[in-house]
Amino acid sequence: MTAQPQVLKIRRPDDWHIHLRDGDMLKTVVPYTSELYGRAIVMPNLAPPVTTVDAAIAYRQRILDAVPTDHDFTPLMTCYLTDSLDPNEVECGFNEGVFTAAKLYPANATTNSSHGVTSIDAIMPVLERMEKLGMPLLVHGEVTHAEIDIFDREARFIETVMEPLRQRLQGLKVVFEHITTKDAAEYVRDGNELLAATITPQHLMFNRNHMLVGGVRPHLYCLPILKRNIHQQALRELVASGFTRAFLGTDSAPHARHRKEASCGCAGCFNAPTALASYATVFDEMGALEHFEAFASINGPRFYGLPLNETFIELERKESQVEESIALTDDTLIPFLAGEIVHWTVKR
């Protein structure tokens, strides 16, 4: 029997999907990411959303101002697609190195998405320009029609939006973000080299029973919502297989405690402090630690055509307790796995 590794030395990872918010929240959460990750794809769903080059430059500077001086971190900015967006603005931002990608939110699919896209036809000129540029499209893959059950919205999106879009623009590079279903896992697996996926720690670790059985656990509530266990297992099997077009994207999405623990609570898990240990645990449980570094540190840069990070970090097989809460100016943040014991710890 092969001895279990006690230390994992991996190339510094990147987070290919994160929400850093703004203001005091931004200042609180950025260091949890900048300490461990070389880069992060920053979501543009602020209020108002990031739709111009100037707005992205200003937001990038606010992020950099929140990075501790001893951290080496590069935020990668994204453009929020709207029905009225000018293709020239997107091209300008991409060519100037301001926009790394553009984000498609179906209108009202998630937090601060009311400005999102009402139909693919409305943004076709932008998407055609992105295809020519080789600029990645990042997709929140859920339909938002009221008659579609929330647990079916991802699968329906594949049929009615994603596949027709990819047939229409066959050279467009697409990241199917935070996939949550067996349907999506199989769709990405069977796709070509222009289609990739990010997967969150919560969707690998948990299913809807964990969120709903024995009481509602609001800090596991995120969008896309946790699905049944067969979908969780499909995601775990995909990453454990060493599939090279799936990579780390935490979708860390902080909300103040009073906005999570409410009669109408917000969607999102603040997992930045615990995500790396969570991913390592999943790969360990699946007997697939040999694929962990590629998922965390290699697959993403290769898909985006970016260089690998040149520094390394180490995780050790060591138990530690996740802090119960994190102070904000006038509230608290509850991290993913608050108060629980994790079995991998980043060596500092």
Curated annotation (Swiss-Prot):
CDD domains from the entry? DHOase (cd01294)
Identify the domain of life.
Bacteria
Q: Name the InterPro entries for this protein.
A: Amidohydro-rel, DHOdimr, Dihydroorotase_CS, Metal_Hydrolase
Residues of the active site: D251
Q: Which Pfam families match?
A: Amidohydro_1
**Where in the sequence is N6-carboxylysine found?**
K103
Give the Enzyme Commission number: 3.5.2.3
What are the entry keywords?
Hydrolase, Metal-binding, Pyrimidine biosynthesis, Zinc
What residues bind Zn(2+) 1, as annotated?
H17, H19, K103, D251
Textual note on the cofactor: Binds 2 Zn(2+) ions per subunit.
Q: Which SUPFAM superfamilies match?
A: Metallo-dependent hydrolases
| Keyword Metal-binding in annotation | yes
Single Gene Ontology BP annotation: 'de novo' UMP biosynthetic process
> Which PANTHER family does the record cross-reference, listed alphabetically?
DIHYDROOROTASE
How does the record describe its quaternary structure?
A: Homodimer.
What family name appears in the similarity comment? Answer: Belongs to the metallo-dependent hydrolases superfamily. DHOase family. Class II DHOase subfamily.
Q: What is this protein called?
A: Dihydroorotase
According to its UniProt entry, this protein's organism is Enterobacter sp. (strain 638)
